[in-house]
Curated annotation (Swiss-Prot):
Stated name of the protein: DNA-directed RNA polymerase subunit alpha
Family classification: Belongs to the RNA polymerase alpha chain family.
Gene encoding the protein: rpoA
Domain of life: Bacteria
GO MF annotation, one: DNA-directed RNA polymerase activity
Length: 336
C-alpha cells in the first residue's frame, strides 16, 4: 500500500512550547525519523524568517525636511539616522490598507516610539525605542505611513511615482520573526536510540507568539508541498471495516522492545523470537528461565512490567497470533 510510505514513519508524540517572555519561545519536538530534525528545522527556519506577514513603516514625512540627507535645527540626529531608527519601530496592525500615524513633540527630550499617536488597530510594540533627541526649543512633527507585507522591501520599492516632495521612503522589515536557531539531538523511543530531537528557539517582535509563528510556517510548507502530490489520498476504511473485534486485549499487540526493559532482558527476548507482548505472556516462568542467559533478575523485571499492565506470564490467548498482526498493531496502537 502506497500510504505506508508516510504512515509508517514515526511522528513526534511530544511537541512542547515554552515561553520565557512575550518575544521568545522554545520548541521541542521528538521523536523524529533520523534526518528529519535537520530537514524540518531548516525548512521551518527559512519560512519563519522570510514568509510571515507583519507591519512596518514604509515612508515618513518630516515637517521642514525635503530629503533624507537633511538636518533639523535642534535635533541631534540627522535625518538619515532618524530614518534608520524609524525602521526599528515594531508595529502590530490588522487589515491590509495603508494607515498613518503621527508624532509631534517639543524639546528638550527624547522622542520615542511611545510618543507616536496611533489610530484604529495600530499598536506600537516597543514604545521605549528612541527615534531622535531634541534640544531646548526644538520641535519636530513626523507623519508615518504604515502597511502590511512580508519579508524585506527596500526603500526604492516603497517610493511611489506620484509621491509628494518631502515624503521619504523607508526600508520595510515586515517579518515579525527576528531570529530563529535550532539544533538536533539524538533521542530514544523504546529500544531505538537514534531518532532525532528538534530544539528550536524563536524570537519575535511581540506581534505574534513563537508557537503561532511555527504553526503558520508549517501551514505555509504544507500548502506549498501539496502541489507535488500527484495522487488522490487512498480512501480510508469505513468504520465497519476498521473495527475488528479482537478476542484479546489490544495491549498484546504492543512490541516487547517498547517496554523499555534492560538491554540484557530485551536481548534474551529477541533471541527467543518473542516479538509481541502476546508472545511473551503465553510463556511460563519455567520456560522463560530455560532461555539462554535469562536469569531470575530478568524474570522479576518482566513480571513487574507485565503486572503494571494487568498481565502476567502463563496466560492463554485465544486466536494468537492473528494472521494480520502487523496491520492490527497499527490500527490499535492508540489503545495501548
Amino acid at each position: 500500500m502506497i500510504q505506508k510510505n508516510w504512515q509508517e514513519l514515526i511522528k513526534p508524540n511530544k511537541v512542547e512550547f515554552s515561553s520565557s517572555s512575550r518575544t521568545r519561545a522554545t520548541l521541542v519536538a521528538e521523536p523524529l525519523e533520523r534526518g528529519f530534525g535537520l530537514t524540518l528545522g531548516n525548512a521551518l527556519r527559512r519560512v519563519l524568517l522570510s514568509s510571515l506577514r507583519g507591519a512596518a513603516v514604509t515612508a515618513v514625512q518630516i515637517d521642514g525636511v525635503l530629503h533624507e540627507f537633511s538636518s533639523i535645527p535642534g535635533v541631534r540626529e540627522d535625518v538619515t539616522d532618524i530614518v534608520l531608527n524609524i525602521k526599528e519601530i515594531a508595529i502590530k496592525m490588522d487589515g491590509d490598507d495603508a494607515k498613518r500615524m503621527v508624532v509631534r513633540k517639543q524639546g528638550p527630550g527624547v522622542v520615542t516610539a511611545g510618543d507616536i499617536q496611533t489610530v484604529g488597530d495600530i499598536e506600537i510594540l516597543n514604545p521605549e525605542h528612541v527615534i531622535c533627541t531634541l534640544d531646548e526649543g526644538a520641535e519636530i512633527r513626523m507623519e508615518f505611513t504604515v502597511n502590511n507585507g512580508k519579508g524585506y522591501v527596500p526603500a526604492e520599492r516603497n517610493r511611489a511615482e506620484d509621491a509628494p516632495i518631502g515624503l521619504i521612503p523607508v526600508d520595510s522589515l515586515y517579518s515579525p520573526v527576528k531570529k530563529v536557531s535550532y539544533k538536533v539531538e539524538n533521542t530514544r523511543e523504546g529500544q531505538v536510540l537514534d531518532y532525532d530531537k528538534l530544539n528550536m528557539t524563536i524570537e519575535t517582535d511581540g506581534s505574534i507568539t513563537g508557537e503561532d509563528a511555527v504553526a503558520f510556517a508549517a501551514r505555509i510548507l504544507q500548502d506549498q508541498l501539496g502541489v507535488f502530490v500527484n495522487f488522490d489520498e487512498p480512501q480510508k476504511e469505513t468504520e465497519e471495516e476498521a473495527v475488528t473485534e479482537l478476542a484479546f486485549n489490544p495491549a498484546l499487540l504492543k512490541k516487547v522492545d517498547e517496554l523499555e526493559l534492560s538491554v540484557r532482558s530485551a536481548n534474551c527476548l529477541k533471541n527467543d523470537n518473542i516479538v509481541y507482548i502476546g508472545d511473551l505472556i503465553q510463556k511460563t516462568e519455567a520456560e522463560m528461565l530455560r532461555t539462554p542467559n535469562f536469569g531470575r533478575k530478568s524474570l522479576n523485571e518482566i513480571k513487574e512490567v507485565l503486572a503494571s499492565m494487568g498481565l502476567h506470564l502463563g496466560m492463554e490467548v485465544p486466536a494468537w497470533p492473528p494472521e494480520n498482526i502487523e496491520d492490527l498493531a497499527k490500527r490499535y496502537e492508540d489503545q495501548y
